[in-house]
């Protein structure tokens, strides 16, 4: 009986693992119904080294953590069978460690979560950051590496591209592959270059059209003035209309009649200071 009493007294030092959980503890009865344990015999006495482990349990157990204690099992033998399925925990040299015994594991858990995120795309908000998340299986890209670098074309590459654009404003897929191999570029580089070059060409064409429309509107007035002057000179050079009888006055020269009178001369008959000769009378 001494060994059994020592065993029952030692179980009071054991702290239930549920005691380390935070929050209110529901009220429950520690005494199970007697029908569950009828016919069961009490466990055998512990081995001799159990006394040494009790001292270790008493020294290493955290003080005043559990909100309640297991009631003494000596008064109720049925409650002693609650822990008969945990013989290994009673024989441990140290008590079961709590989730955060000394407050040191909390900081250790928070620091890795700040450094290593479960998904790399959750850390960066810049564009094109997904390219470097699988490099080497680890996400160690700097913010500077996420920026897209501008492609620098050489003179030989630009010359070949300009020559191709001179003949074809839109490049086909086979020709694009051929140029990519010849110029040591990617198809994407050539495609983007042709897109930018077409936009530049369209802007130049629009500028030429707008400048041509402005110059054409200003120069269109001069031909109208020339036409007006020319038409006036032609009107002055034209001979006067013939009389209704069809007879042409004798004072009008033949050049005026044919319409070949110079512009400085008038087609109207000029009064002559010489008196007309009288017709000679027949003798």
Swiss-Prot record:
Residues 146-205 bind DNA. Its main location: nucleus. Duodenum and pancreas (Langerhans islet beta cells and small subsets of endocrine non-beta-cells, at low levels in acinar cells). The modification Phosphothreonine is found at residue 151. Residues 13-73 are annotated as: Transactivation domain. The modification Phosphoserine is found at residue 268. Gene3D superfamilies: Homeodomain-like. The keyword Nucleus applies. Phosphorylated by the SAPK2 pathway at high intracellular glucose concentration. Phosphorylated by HIPK2 on Ser-268 upon glucose accumulation. This phosphorylation mediates subnuclear localization shifting. Phosphorylation by PASK may lead to translocation into the cytosol. Residues 36-81, 201-283 are annotated as: Disordered. A motif (Nuclear localization signal) lies at residues 197-203. The Antp-type hexapeptide mediates heterodimerization with PBX on a regulatory element of the somatostatin promoter. This is Pancreas/duodenum homeobox protein 1. It comes from Rattus norvegicus. The gene is Pdx1.
